[in-house]
Amino acid sequence: GHNQFRRFVQAHHTWKVGGKPTVYPISTSFNYGDPTPCNEYTCLTTDYAIAMVKRYEQFKLVPEVFWLDAGWYNHSADVANHKNWANTVGNWTVDSIRFPEGLRPIADEVHRVGSKFMVWFEPERVMKGSAWALQHPQWMLDARGKAKQEDWTKDGEHDSYLFNLGNPEACRWMSKYIGDFLEENGIDYYRQDFNIEPEGFWSANDEPGRQGICEIRYIEGLYSFWEYLLNRFPGLLVDNCASGGRRIDLESISRSAPMWRTDYSYGEPIGYQCHTYGLNLYLPLHGTG
């Protein structure tokens, strides 16, 4: 039964490029290793990233993909004011201090050694007071106290909106914004995170007598957004990490790749193998990052 289900998923619910199922690439990152006060990629600079690419080339260890994760955008490196990668989402412009020419110089170096360039985004979670929240308040879903918060967000610095992908105008705007960003910065693969509990935002904004309609329209918008990117960039891979494994339903993996199947993967190799065993019964393709 498991083999039959896996064949079904492979045939009908796996993103294909050129008619063939996507093969997940061997990837590496530019991570500093998070020395204090850095977190994720908030201490990364253009020079450091390019030096990392050259280092991999020096030892003939060039991967298929170089991966830039969270913390490349405005305000994410402002540790003096308690800012970090997580509480500055919604500021989707490149930090010009650390990356004065944008991300294109890094992309060019990655392409020089024959690799692809993948960059992390989390466009759905929008911090209150961020650029998107201030510029487009009409597209922000507010949970109005109904959202469930995870422990790591209960510090008073992670109060956010949910970008309303269920609004067609908002969805079209975001699709073009992200698409233009990928093109201008030479990005080959798009990595989308989702560190938020959406149910409270949806239920707080349902129309009277139409319970669940906000969620339905939102998910339709999400799929439309991914399809826009995939149609605009043939060969694009959408890595849907979503806090690790939160979007491995059949419709999501039909359009994207769970290349980071769980955030539990930080430094626990026995856990990796347990996940490999369990998920292999159902999903023919998934990754640890």
Tell where the protein language model's regions lie, with residue ranges:
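Aromatic-lined carbohydrate-binding/catalytic grooves of carbohydrate-active enzymes
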Residues: 23-179, 185, 189
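N-terminal/domain-start segments enriched in small and hydrophobic, helix-friendly residues
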Residues: 177-220
